[in-house]
Amino acid sequence: MKIMLYTNKMVSGGAERVIANLANYLSQENEVILMTYIKGKSFYELDKKIKFYSCLNKEITKKRFDNIIALKNIYSIVKSESPDIILSFLETPNLHMLLLKKILKVPLIISVRNDPSQIFNTRLKKLTLKYLYKRADGLVLQTKEAKEYFNETIQKKSVIIPNPVNPKFLKEPYCGQREKKIVSVGRLVNQKQQDVLIDAFEIVNKEYNDYKLVIYGEGELRNKLQEKINDIGLNEKISLPGNVANIENEIYKYSMFVLSSKYEGMPNSLMEAMALGIPSISTDCPCGGPKFLIDNNKNGILVKVNDKKEMAKAMKKIIQDSKFANFIAKNASERLKELEPGKINKIWQNFILEIYSKNNRR
């Protein structure tokens, strides 16, 4: 079978890692084409057999007519390659493929990687959902709550496939004395609400001033977050080191991980921390990814969104009760073994075959 995957770009990120992993898996027994909207090499290693295309000859796009150029180029590439099925990922690529669906006449699976209520948050986007999403032959979502957002017609075409955990992170929990560091990993953007985490840490620091907070990642809020850190006088305790390679080695011995997001799909950073056996705290945010991963007080702690006091209380609990911290860390590591890549990729493969077979019978 010839399978085409289409996404925005293959930079460092959770969705991109999942796409690369899936493309490599599918390429073992299929001809695979990976196409990006924006020009750029893949951050993740791809099998040499995989063909790679970019729809635009630029690395940044903000102009509306870029979409028109992309649609024209997508049409040409698809007609030239004649894939048996197309998988698209993320909002803009999904829109491109849905617009072209009727003229391409290729079975299409679209994947929604985040909270649908945040994606379809304007009148125009809701119209897109109403009139275009029903064109897809299949829809992949990450949680039950995400699936329930859609109408019955779309739900019947849908399947829930969680993210696979990166196998580099599947380790036995660290048994020694942990470093007095609290870690968070994610883009420095409004969705991740690192400002709430900083506020929670400020509360914790008043009682436990020997701990440090390390927030890995880059993004548009870096300067604003640094200003906040400076304003509260914690620039010696809170650091923003940016992106680092082999982060699993950096954070393995840290005392805890905290995810402060206001919404998520299936958060890779939380999955990876739990797989490493790091005691983990997350907001119980829509669309249910953290709740899918964490059984509260059994393998992690769930707290309310945007509640710095509850978050600080959870952080203190892990600091104060080492027996509890070790208990949730061990259970977290066991939970994430259920999401190893081979199992998840097999679910993808079966759904691809199901949609392809249905279309071939028509």
Question: Residues of each region from the PLM?
Answer:
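A short, well-ordered alpha-helix in the C-terminal region of glycosyltransferases
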Residues: 226, 237, 310, 317, ...
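A conserved mid-protein helix/loop that constitutes part of the nucleotide-sugar donor-binding site
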Residues: 16-21, 95, 180, 184-206, ...
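Carbohydrate-associated surface elements
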Residues: 145, 164
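Short His-centered aromatic/hydrophobic patch
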Residues: 39, 88-94, 112
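Conserved acidic donor-binding segment of nucleotide-sugar-dependent glycosyltransferases
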Residues: 295-297, 301-308, 317-322
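Aromatic "clamp/platform" in nucleotide-sugar-dependent glycosyltransferases that forms part
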Residues: 243, 262
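N-terminal strand-loop element at the rim of the active site
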Residues: 5-21, 25-66, 151, 221
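Short hydrophobic beta-strand element within catalytic cores of glycosyltransferases
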Residues: 279-284
